[in-house]
């Protein structure tokens, strides 16, 4: 008997490993859009594989959507406003909406990292702040320009120890 559509394995819904942003050849994490596949519309849940030497996204913050990340496997680092923080399996990280705190997850190890990423989905008035990618941000209609002031540390938000 075929399983019902409300049961899915992340491997069966994982997307292609393609560059993540228009105009960039950089590859980011490889995501499986679980919530969308399961028909959930109000929350977003993704399984993310983060190969060595990659990050999940450009550093960003969101105005109206909260984000939650749980480390399933591996030892990533979370970049928060220019500082790296080491994580391990079982660690959770939360980003309340509207704070302007910018983040991305980076895999500076030789082993793959797996993350469970959850958040609110498709809020009409959500805006996104990309502090280190102003050219890309300028192309977006959902650019967040009136975010709270942020102060950034020395790390450039990219894989490696810079």
Model-predicted regions and their roles:
Residues 82-98:
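Short acidic-glycine-tyrosine-enriched beta hairpin
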Residues 1-42, 128-162:
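A short, N-terminal "cap"/entry segment at the start of jelly-roll beta-barrel domains
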Residues 40-45, 63-66, 71-73, 88, ...:
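Short connector loops at helix/strand junctions that flank enzyme active sites
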